[in-house]
Amino acid sequence: MRTITCSACAMMKQALKWIALAGVTLVMAQATVSAEDKVSVLMKQGLADMAGKVVTVLTVDYAPGAVSDAHVHPGSVFAYVLEGSVVSQVEDEEPMTHTKGQSWYELPKKPHLVSKNASQTEPAKLLVFLLSQESELIKAPIK
């Protein structure tokens, strides 16, 4: 059996510290990159008086600092802030900050360039009604 000298122990301890630091840094970087929205569909209902049209009711939860990718909605969007505050920018309009109790409307097929939690420390939540064609997705990424 080989005896490890004190200098070898010190080198191993130092190497383990660097490995641990690298692991923590990687986890923190992944957490920052993956902070996105969480969409939950509550209801999807066809409209009897509008053939082929559906209303989708959903919530969008934003963790602190969360950001949605730029996207487009196929139909009309009606959004209401249930909790926190959200920054939204559609097409060439100025970014707007909407707080709890406020609502807004988005025209169909307009690029939604910014949609994010305005806070780095508090969550935010939206209630959204989307009126669209039955076959369309809730949102599509901007290419």
Please provide the spans of the model-predicted regions:
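Extracytoplasmic
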Residues: G52-V57, H73, E93, K109, ...
